Structure formats: structure tokens, C-alpha cells
């Protein structure tokens, strides 16, 4: 029976007429069997009488549930335990009154009718409520966050204790009623006790009630455990996203209980962490702009050069990220760090004398030797910041770019004559971006080259000055380079 009840319950949304009818039909059949086993007076009625009377009451109850109560506030709040328990209790009153007037049943028999229908109403409502909430959880988008309801907080521990107490009490009451009924029956049928058939009948009745109660209890516990697993799985997936650095994720809050409160407090903590992270990022960006502006103030380079080169680097990185050999390194977070760090590639120029840095003509060999020190100066400055502020991905990438963006693929660059993949990818990307922008920009010692001419020079340098893979990426996104150059033009 447990499997059948579960299969019905899992078809539910918030309200499902066939499901409700199926569970009401099941409750009606079981109640009809229940009555003949707990009440000696009801046991005197024929199967046809009980089936007709109980069937009529349960069909009427379902019709009321289907028409008048489907939009009831309890139904809209998925509080089906209250709704179905109250409905079947109300329907048990006229049935008990009918038995009292038609068959002169005693008060205890009438109370057994009230108890039985109310009990099956509780079980039916519990299955409908749990299955409805489970389906809602499974259909709800992972990103949707619900506020805690304004209802009074319901403790999971108290709910479990209450359910266990209710089930134990129900089992005790029902078995007691069966025992009393069987004692009455044996008193009037002593021969059944002597021939042993009475014992078998009593065992069957106890087994029937245990099976019915056990089936409902098992179905309720299975649905409840599935709902808890769904909630915990959702929260675990959210926390896994947080551990990967996504502080915009929030834990879904499904209920006003301990789990809901933990999720709400966790979300408040994530709000605070996100605000702190945003403040740190803002401070970092201000530092980047300040350092970049300092370098610009001593160089002939313009602010637009800084903007263009970081956009070039981002375009190249996003293209290469689509390839398996680069996808592990070039994650969205890493590309964002590249983009933020790129403006610091020439920060070391603040340590170059003005006589060299601002010289309008060609540098002498001695002057060029001095100029070639700016990558080391920039990397050393960022290393000092790293020692004082602690290691961070941003400072590490900024230091890489500053130190290696003048290295060449064939090992003829500076300052360390690194060759091939010994040059960090960040430096290889910036090398092409920096040269391209220098080629298309006007300087006191040269006019601005066209995109096509700059492109030809870069292609010629593939495998010598530049990483061939980066050159291929440049050719694939050259239209983006043209658009970036047009958007961030030097001021006239």
C-alpha cells in the first residue's frame, strides 16, 4: 500500500483532482474496513450497507473538497492537513448521527466513527501537503529566493516529536478499540475461541490495522525525507557555488523552521560578505586607476592607451578561453583579473628618468638599457605591495604582466629573455596588445599606422615576437580590435 500511496502523492502539484480523489477513495475503502474491525455494532451491518453509506459520505466529501474548498485559504497555503482533517471530521458528524438514529448505536460507536474519519483525514491531508510541497520545491528555480513566511515559526524537532506522539497515540487507541471489540465478540462467540478460529481472526484484525497505519506512516516519512533531501540538496548546491567565489548566490528559504532560519542567517552573512568584497574591489580599482594615472603623468602615453590595451587583452583572452588547452586557466574570474590588472603593465615607468622616458627621438643604447628596467621596477613595486598586503590573485597577475609584457616568443625580449611558454600567458597577451596599440597610435617620433599595416607587422612577428596562438586569436577578433580603437580614441 505504501508504494501505491507514494505513486499517487508524487503526481500532485498544489491541487490535483485525480490525486485527491484517489486518496479520498483509498481513505473511504480503508475506513469501511476499519469500522467493522473496531466497533461491534458496525460489524453487524452488511458489507453493502457499509459500502453504500461510507461511499456516499466520502464522495460527498471529495465533491465539497473539489468545488467549495479548492480555493480555501488553507489550500492556497498548502495547509492540507488542517483542511482535510477538518473536512472529514465535519463529514463524520452526520454519518455518526445517521448511525445513532437509524441503528441506535451507542456513544462509543459514534466516537469511533468520528475518530476514524478524522484520522484518515489527517493521513490524507499529510500526504497531499507533503507531496505538494515536494513538487513545488522541484519545480522552483534554483535562483529563486523566498522570504520566510509571516506565520509563526514551526520547529522541525517539535513537528517530528508531535508526529511520533500522534502516531503512537493513534496506534494505541486503535488497537485498544480492536481489543475491546474482540473481547465483546468472543464473549458472544465462545466457540470461536475454543476452536482457534477466534485467535486467527483477532490476529488478522491487528495485522490489518498495523498494515494500514504502517503504510500511511511509511508514506508520510518517505515524502518528508524526500522533501528534506530536496531542501538540503538545494542549499548544498548554493553553498558549493559560494565556495567557488560566487557571492551573489543565496540559499533558498522554503519554510519557517530551523532550516529556513539557518538559510536566512547564511544569506545575511553572504550579503555582508558581498558588500565587503565589493568594497575591496572598489578600493582595488581605485588603486589601479591611481597607479596608472601616476605612470601616465610621467609618460607620453595617454589614458586611452590604458583603456584600449586592457580591452584588447580581454578580447584575446575570451577567444582563447573557448579552447580546451586554455579553458582551465582562462576562467571568467581570471579574465576579469587580467582586465583589471592590465592598466598596471607600465607602472614601472615611474622609476625611469625623464631624460629617457620623455626623449622625443630614438634612444641610445645606454638609454634603452635604462628603459628596459621598467618591467623589473614595476614588478618589484608590486612585489613590495604583495609582501605588505598579502598574496592575492590580482597582485600576482599584475606583477606577471608588468614583468613579462616585453618578453618575446623566441627569447630575444627583456628583461629575462624568457622563451615560448616560459612566458606567462598574461604577458604574451599584453605583448601583442601593447605593440598593436603602439603601432596604431601617433607618437612624436612616428605617425599612426593603419590597422592593416599594424596587422601585417604582427603577423610577421608570429613565432618570433609573438605567441602564434595569440596571433591567431588576434586575427580571429581583429574586428573587435578595430572597434575598440575607434571607441577609445586619443583626445585631439
Curated annotation (Swiss-Prot):
CDD domains per record: HAMP, HDc
Any single biological process term in GO: signal transduction
UniProt catalytic activity: 3',3'-c-di-GMP + 2 H2O = 2 GMP + 2 H(+)
Entry superkingdom: Bacteria
Residue ranges crossing the lipid bilayer per the database entry: 14-34, 49-69, 80-100, 111-131, 160-180, 205-225
GO molecular function annotations of the record: phosphoric diester hydrolase activity
Gene Ontology CC terms: plasma membrane
Pfam families according to UniProt: HAMP, HD_5, MASE10
Topological relation to the membrane, as annotated: Multi-pass membrane protein
Domain HAMP: 226-278
Compartments in which it is found: Cell inner membrane
Function description: Phosphodiesterase (PDE) that catalyzes the hydrolysis of cyclic diguanylate (c-di-GMP) to GMP in vitro. Increases motility and decreases biofilm formation in vivo.
Protein name, per record: Cyclic di-GMP phosphodiesterase VC_1295
